[in-house]
A protein has these predicted regions:
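Ligand-binding pockets and gating/stacking loops
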Residues: 1-475
Length: 475
């Protein structure tokens, strides 16, 4: 039965001493045992010799990462967030504005600067007839699975602040990231993997802040050609095997029983221990998840032998294994100049892999339960950037931006909202960043105003009580 919103429900999302029964500073300081070997048997659910249930990260786990049913009907169970860092130009990607061409090089009414129409053409694609830019030919093939939001806007068009806002829902420092909130609310389906994994990006985008540290994103620095031990540093313990580590766990369990009554909570130490525990658990599964050489050649070809191709293939493998939230960073969208060459380069890097991800998830029956989100921190101006570049570009614009979503319960083959005739600002059915965040949480089964965490005497929320669900994009 889906739990109602009650104090008990919220308390069950907060780790208790029973969940984190592992504070033993003296033991850690005096023992020579490696940290990676000291994962709590109680959290792993392991017997001394290990069990099939433990090895598969079964759903009968307890503790802060145990899976929890959302309080409301959910469309999506997992999220893949493709973050286009730098601020993609909406008019050069997903928001056609033919009126701009009539004013090329002229001053636009009500705007300061010379009009800069997109050099790229749009054409209707799919059964839905949504207009898609020529720089996204592969995504045009799957447009009937996608919802394009053309009326998104943000508060401050400065990179650091806007990136923080998109990823944490706050203009202030520090606040928990989107992935941390999601895993805090839902737990994760695989206890042998982190619930929140990032492939690139800044630490601030994956921070847990005042949430318990177990909800922080685990970053993986991946690059094509990397070996597994380079992708996942220190994933294995070179000094001992898993069997011996399990025996050590049994020994640690006995120490836990002896010292449980003396337990004193130490948040910083608990966070470090939880990280070491996860490192042990990942030995059994993470190496497999990140090894894309195990994929058929046909599948690797579908995604492409590129950085983004490999990262999105890994994202699918992670979601397939029960990881709740995966963020893939894709930088380079800060096009103050050279739009003519920069946009095709950037779009080309993500077009094929993102289309492959949609097709692959659909073929596996995972698209309906996996929400894919693409977008950056703001949009760009529709006038030329005054930076003196011979090849024109665009400046930052927080009043107009674009994002698309696919799978996870969104309506396919649709657009929502619109900018004005030139694309300078969101005008019709405006969607603020808080609205986008509220909609994401709704698709996952949460009322964004009721998913709270109490800290320093007040209840905090991802949206800080702002925002409205965009119901028209939900199927």
């Amino acid at each position: 039965m889906t739990p109602a919103y009650t104090d008990k429900y919220l308390r069950e999302h907060t780790p208790t001493l029973k969940d984190l029964i592992f504070t033993r500073r003296e033991f850690l300081e005096r023992t020579g045992m490696g940290f990676g070997a000291m994962s709590l048997a109680s959290i792993l659910g392991m017997s001394v010799g290990g069990t099939a249930e433990a090895d598969t990260g079964a759903l009968k786990a307890s503790g802060p990462l145990a899976p929890k049913a959302p309080p409301l009907p959910a469309k999506a169970k997992a999220v893949i967030h493709i973050f286009a860092e730098g601020g993609p130009s909406h008019v050069d990607t997903w928001d056609p504005k033919p009126e701009l061409a009539k004013y090329d090089g002229q001053t636009l009414p009500g705007l300061d600067g010379l009009a800069f129409p997109s050099p790229f053409k749009y054409a209707k694609k799919g059964k839905s007839g949504v207009e898609v830019c020529e720089v996204f030919p592969k995504l045009g093939e799957v447009i009937d699975e996608m919802t394009v939001i053309r009326s998104l806007w943000t508060d401050i068009p400065a990179h650091e602040v806007a990136q923080r806002f998109m990823n944490t829902g706050s203009l202030q420092i520090p606040k928990p990231s989107m992935g941390s909130w999601v895993v805090y609310g839902l737990g994760t389906q695989n206890q042998n993997m982190p619930g929140f994994i990032t492939l690139g990006g800044k630490p601030e985008w994956r921070q847990a802040s005042f949430l318990p540290g177990i909800y922080q994103g685990c970053n993986v620095n991946y690059a094509p050609g990397m070996k597994l031990d380079e992708i996942l540093l220190n994933i294995s313990n070179p000094f001992t095997g898993l069997d011996r580590q399990r025996r050590q766990l049994s020994f640690v369990r006995e120490l836990d029983k002896m010292h449980a009554e003396k337990l004193q909570k130490d948040e910083q130490l608990e966070t470090r221990i939880e990280s070491f525990e996860m490192a042990f658990k990942m030995q059994t599964e993470a190496t497999d998840a990140f090894d894309i050489s195990k994929e058929p050649q046909q599948m690797r070809d579908l995604y492409g032998a590129t950085d983004m191709g490999a990262k999105l293939l890994i994202a699918r493998r992670l979601v397939e294994r029960g990881v709740r939230f995966v963020q893939v960073q894709h930088g380079g969208w800060d096009t103050h100049g050279n739009v003519q060459t920069a946009i095709p380069r950037q779009a080309g890097a993500v077009d094929g892999p993102a289309a492959a991800l949609i097709k692959d998830l659909k073929q596996r029956g995972l698209l309906d339960s996996t929400l894919i989100i693409w977008g950056g921190e703001f949009g760009r101006t529709v006038v030329r950037d005054r930076n003196g570049n011979a090849a024109p570009g665009r400046d930052h614009n927080g009043r107009a931006m674009v994002a698309w979503m696919a799978g996870g319960g969104v309506k396919g083959g649709t657009t929502y909202g619109a900018t004005d005739e030139f694309g300078a600002r969101a005008a019709e059915n405006k969607v603020h960043i808080h609205d986008l965040h509220a909609t994401i949480l709704a698709l996952l089964g949460f009322d964004h105003k009721k998913l709270t965490y109490r800290y320093n005497g007040r209840d905090f929320r991802f949206t800080d009580n702002f925002g409205n669900v965009v119901k028209d994009v939900i199927a």
